[in-house]
UniProtKB/Swiss-Prot annotation:
Organism the protein comes from: Enchytraeus buchholzi
Similarity annotation: Belongs to the aldehyde dehydrogenase family.
Catalysed reactions, as listed in the record: an aldehyde + NAD(+) + H2O = a carboxylate + NADH + 2 H(+)
PANTHER family in the cross-refs: ALDEHYDE DEHYDROGENASE-RELATED (PTHR11699)
GO biological process, one term: ethanol catabolic process
Protein's name in the database: Aldehyde dehydrogenase
Length: 497
């Protein structure tokens, strides 16, 4: 099968949507404040965006609550109508995919080809998956003791607060919206302040798709103001968040201090990628390289700790360094480039500081380790060896193109070392031995384990983490259940039914 043709990006794309979206209208912030969103390839301003804060969150939550009232238009819709709206939104994303991916590459910095073939397609898929689920939410009849008819209802949890990260802005906005709407909820979405533009473009498509006013509201703003207001709001029934573990902990605290709102968290990772000597070495080197370098290393489940058996360690390192040196970095609109910039200057500085800490603590820098150029936020693909588990680079989430390669001797040792982390989002094992593969997969403390592959996702399957990598699951029916409350009803009957 030939590779899909990638269209040209939109030249000189005008940033059209920069306002807050409440009740199907674009409005200015209550305060009148704006914030700049920056092109990470150049460091230059793309646009000024309306800066929502507590007052704007209050307005958005009120709109979502009004849309959720029992007598509201939205609540009178059939479940299949909610599915139809999600299908329509997916179709509109497909129709606008070139504009959306151009905008995402400008605002986020990821290569245009990756945006077009990956993120936009994922957004469409997740919307269509949950669109099909909307009219298939069913309860049970229960053979309870006594003269009663007993059944369950699965009801929408209510008003949802969704907070999305900057690494997959459009895809993860759609991933929050889809199950919430399928379940019958309304929501307020706050996109990451680094990358608000595709979420606001999506807002225009929400209105075009025909969603009733107030069902989906999108408020750009800063995390410590708009984000905090959303997580602490007493009229929000559930928070769904993807981002850092530190912010996830604040969300849990906010839930406990307010109304015990339901919480789903998909947080950080330090995922082990284990290579056994019987694996296909060329394949394992390439997949391990992509597992940490793709999206500039800005992936929560990136294979950031590569464990290689001692029998193939030296050759694996040699080939991995050779591959990293060949990885092309530069303008994300140039199809020859595999990596664009990191998302912003803060992230750039964090990555470079952690690289320096690795060198200081005794890790061997095999290649890379420096900023590329002085314009934009580009980092060289970097490989470290001689890393120990006590080093900061081995413990902290770098979220950049930095591969750490460890040596191991046997299965039990590598399982113990792989699990020696506070995270547990994902893991991988490469081997031709099914017994080894299953032993390792079943022993790893991770929500997802890949065998002889990496970063393979299906919306039919749940995704989420053990330990400090999160709480709850997204995708599949597990992800839908997170937006539902289960009610048990007993009806007294004259006789046993």
């Amino acid at each position: 099968m030939s590779a899909p043709k990638i269209p040209e990006p939109v030249k000189d794309l005008k940033v059209e949507f920069t306002k807050i979206f409440i009740n199907n209208e674009f409005v200015d912030s209550v305060s009148g404040k704006t914030f700049a969103t920056i092109n990470p390839s150049t460091g230059e301003k793309l646009a000024e965006v309306q800066e929502g804060d507590k007052a704007d969150i209050d307005k958005a939550v009120a709109a979502a609550r009004a849309a959720f009232k029992r007598d509201a238009e939205y609540r009178k819709h059939d479940a299949s109508d909610r599915g139809r709206l999600l299908f329509k939104l997916a179709d509109l994303i497909e129709a606008h995919r070139v504009q959306l991916r151009t905008l995402e590459t400008l605002d986020n910095g990821k290569p245009f080809a990756m945006s077009y073939l990956g993120d936009t397609l994922m957004a469409q898929k997740v919307l269509r998956y949950y669109a099909g689920f909307a009219d298939k939410i069913v309860g049970q009849t229960i053979p309870a003791d006594g003269n009663v008819f007993c059944y369950t209802r699965h009801e929408p949890v209510g008003v949802v607060g969704a907070i999305t990260p900057w690494n997959f802005p459009l895809h993860l906005a759609a991933s929050k919206i889809a199950p919430a709407i399928a379940a019958g909820c309304t929501l307020v979405l706050k996109p990451a302040e680094q990358t608000p533009l595709t979420a606001l473009y999506l807002a225009s498509l929400v209105k075009q798709a025909g969603f009733p006013a107030g069902v989906i509201n999108i408020v750009p703003g800063l995390g410590h103001t708009a984000g905090a207001a959303l997580t602490n709001h007493p009229d929000i029934n559930k928070i769904t968040f993807t981002g850092s573990t530190e912010v996830g902990q604040l969300i849990i605290q906010g839930s406990g201090k307010t109304n015990l709102k339901r919480v789903t968290l998909e947080l950080g990772g330090k995922s082990p990628n284990i290579i056994f000597p019987d694996s296909d070495l060329d394949y394992a080197v390439e997949v391990s390289h992509q597992a940490i370098m793709a999206n500039m290393g800005q992936v929560c489940c990136a294979g950031s700790r590569t464990f290689v058996h001692e029998d193939i360690y030296e050759e694996f390192v040699r080939r991995s360094v050779e591959r990293a040196k060949k990885r092309t970095v530069g303008d994300p609109f140039d199809p020859k480039n595999e990596n664009g910039p990191q998302v912003d200057e803060t992230q750039l500085k964090k990555i470079l500081e952690l690289i320096e800490s690795g060198k200081t603590e005794g890790a061997k820098l095999e290649c890379g380790g420096k900023r590329l150029g002085d314009k934009g936020y580009f980092v060289e693909p970097t490989v470290f060896t001689d890393v120990t588990s006590s080093m900061r680079v081995a413990k902290e989430e770098i979220f950049g193109p930095v591969q750490l390669i460890f040596k191991f001797k046997d299965v039990d040792e590598v399982i113990e070392r792989a699990n020696d982390t506070s995270y547990g989002l994902a893991a991988a094992v490469f081997t031709k031995n099914i017994d080894t593969a299953l032993k390792v997969a079943n022993s790893l403390e991770a929500g997802t384990v890949w065998v002889n592959t990496y970063n393979h996702f299906a919306f039919q399957a749940p995704f989420g983490g053990y330990k400090m990598s999160g709480q709850g699951r997204e995708f599949g029916h597990y992800g839908l259940e997170a937006f539902l409350e289960v009610k048990t009803v007993y009806v007294r009957t004259p006789t046993k039914l």
